[in-house]
Amino acid sequence: MLGVATLVFALIHLIPGDPAQAMLGETASEQDVQALRERLGLDRPLFEQYGAFLAGIARGDLGTSLRTNEPVATAILDRLPATLELAAAAMVVSIGVAIPLGIIAAVRRGTFLDHLATTLALTGISIPNFWLGPLLAIVFAVELGWLPVAGRGTAAHLVLPAISLGAALAAILARMTRASLLEELREPYVQAARARGTSRARAVLRHAFRNSLIPVVTLVGLQFGGVLTGAVITETIFAWPGVGRLLIQSIGFRDYPLVQGCILFIAMTYVAMNLLTDLAYGVLDPRIRYE
């Protein structure tokens, strides 16, 4: 995390523009801008600002927003439920679509259903969410009027952002599920189960499918960080009041502490998900033991 913190600090301070100038506006005098820079501590050398930044992280203090004077941790925690709600909905959409699609494609390999599932997966991977989001909004919100286009309040507000965010992950998971399940179906133990009279559905779902889940779970854990990153774009498109939108707004205002805090939060969440993924291996495969 030290490397992430250092990289974030360096990149943030390379962004062109002056936070004090952005806060006061273009019409502010040089004296007012300089006074605000001194009050915010932006006139100090970068190494002093960097040291204060690391010391704050060590204390659990991410600093204070330059624009609102609100603690960064408080600002992130206020937006966190919305981001977690969107991320969870996107994961439910992606897993709920991908797993059945991957199973059907593997079991019906070479048939029309397999080709259809493969085509859908390739389409989902090819369409970026910054293009899919506006397309969904135009079709289902503006033209058809079936769903709200922006905001957060009801379950209907969640549908379009969740589909936009989860589509690419669903496509990737479907391909992984298909490939992993096909590999397991070739294993001798599956053939032995079928020879003992086990039905095909039972052999697939009870034996092959469970063993094929390990790479799928790995991918889900790794892609969760991608979901949080994609949420930055999706939340901005649909005006979803989460951490991703907060990050974009703070970049626009050159709010260094808030930008740093949001990026660190995403990085720490990614690390935590990788840890949980490793722990899930032992549940899926009893042969795996941790020392």
Predicted regions and their residues:
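Alpha-helical transmembrane segments of integral membrane proteins
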Residues: 74-113, 142, 152-291
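An internal, D/E-rich "acidic patch" concept
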Residues: 43-99
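Membrane-interfacial helix-loop-helix junctions in multi-pass membrane proteins
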Residues: 38-47, 59-72, 150, 173, ...
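Hydrophobic alpha-helical transmembrane segments of multi-pass integral membrane proteins
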Residues: 2-6, 46, 88-92, 131, ...
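Transmembrane-helix boundary motif in ABC transporter permease subunits
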Residues: 9, 13-14, 66, 90-122, ...
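Hydrophobic alpha-helical transmembrane segments of membrane transport/permease proteins
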Residues: 3-51, 65, 141-160
